[in-house]
From Swiss-Prot:
Alpha-conotoxins act on postsynaptic membranes, they bind to the nicotinic acetylcholine receptors (nAChR) and thus inhibit them. This native peptide blocks mammalian nicotinic acetylcholine receptors composed of alpha-3-beta-2/CHRNA3-CHRNB2 and alpha-3-beta-4/CHRNA3-CHRNB4 subunits. This is Alpha-conotoxin EpI. Residues 1-16 form the signal peptide. The lineage of its organism: Eukaryota, Metazoa, Spiralia, Lophotrochozoa, Mollusca. Its main location: secreted.
Length: 56
């Protein structure tokens, strides 16, 4: 019974680790999209004035 428990824990850990690595690439893509959006905002004077904390 203990062996089955260890196998379940190991399988859960492997699945969790793999899905975490996959979500990291999605986070990178999202942060790149956000950066492009902010750059577009900073080039627009009205948006730049409304968001000085992003456009510095």
């Amino acid at each position: 019974m203990f062996t089955v428990f260890l196998l379940v824990v190991l399988a859960t850990t492997v699945v969790s680790f793999t899905s975490d690595r996959a979500s990291d690439s999605r986070k990178d893509a999202a942060s790149g999209l956000i950066a492009l959006t902010i750059k577009g905002c900073c080039s627009d004077p009205r948006c730049n004035m409304n968001n000085p904390d992003y456009c510095g």
